[in-house]
Amino acid sequence: MGDREQLLQRARLAEQAERYDDMASAMKAVTELNEPLSNEDRNLLSVAYKNVVGARRSSWRVISSIEQKTMADGNEKKLEKVKAYREKIEKELETVCNDVLSLLDKFLIKNCNDFQYESKVFYLKMKGDYYRYLAEVASGEKKNSVVEASEAAYKEAFEISKEQMQPTHPIRLGLALNFSVFYYEIQNAPEQACLLAKQAFDDAIAELDTLNEDSYKDSTLIMQLLRDNLTLWTSDQQDEEAGEGN
């Protein structure tokens, strides 16, 4: 068994054991062999890093909320400790994101030819996602540059997906979902977020007959998430407008 196959086997095993750091390091090594990734390899890479970064994002949110509460309580000594711990988690999160972004730029996006538009959209979406995760914890000038990089990657992926993919394709739908979340949460642009999500949902509904049997479950799940977000975001906007009128 070659190195590549051993690494893939290790990644699958680590996934079953829910040891995502191990899974990510195996898939990083596979990617660095600089050979094209199959759809299964691509998904293993994505799942590994999504879980690794997801754990840090979740920890960061919890600690940030504790930090705000501690600040309100005026407990300086505790605040110092909480702040230091938040910064530690932030560094871990940044390291993970930069690892992924480096793999994308050095190998994955770089090695896509013009006809591999599905892979290219997948990787550009990933690039948008990991810059978005950096934007969640960044501030000042640093935040501006990662926000710009995230939007640029999403936009490039979005253009290719509109030209080359069916509106019901799960990768195109997943991209629309994440890009709309970027507008809502990072850019604080609810109208743009709703417009993008609604357009993606409506386009997919109009072409439901093109739904591929293999991806039916994935596509309908993402459509449901788009609709859930739209419901939530429009009710938030209505609440705000009602508040403004008082």
Swiss-Prot record:
GO CC list: cerebellar granule cell to Purkinje cell synapse; cytoplasm; cytosol; extracellular exosome; intercalated disc; mitochondrion; plasma membrane; presynapse
Sequence positions bearing Phosphoserine: 25, 59
Residues at the site labelled Interaction with phosphoserine on interacting protein: 57, 132
Summary of the tissues where the protein is detected: Expressed mainly in the brain and present in other tissues albeit at lower levels.
Modification comment: Phosphorylated on Ser-59 by protein kinase C delta type catalytic subunit in a sphingosine-dependent fashion.
N-acetylglycine, modified sites: 2
Database matches in InterPro entries: 14-3-3, 14-3-3_CS, 14-3-3_dom_sf, 14-3-3_domain
SUPFAM superfamilies assigned: 14-3-3 protein (SSF48445)
Alphabetical GO biological process terms: glucocorticoid catabolic process; intracellular protein transport; membrane depolarization during action potential; negative regulation of dendrite morphogenesis; nuclear receptor-mediated glucocorticoid signaling pathway; positive regulation of DNA-templated transcription; presynaptic modulation of chemical synaptic transmission; protein localization
Entry keyword set: Acetylation, Phosphoprotein
Family per similarity comment: Belongs to the 14-3-3 family.
Function: Adapter protein implicated in the regulation of a large spectrum of both general and specialized signaling pathways. Binds to a large number of partners, usually by recognition of a phosphoserine or phosphothreonine motif. Binding generally results in the modulation of the activity of the binding partner. Negatively regulates the kinase activity of PDPK1.
Protein name: 14-3-3 protein eta
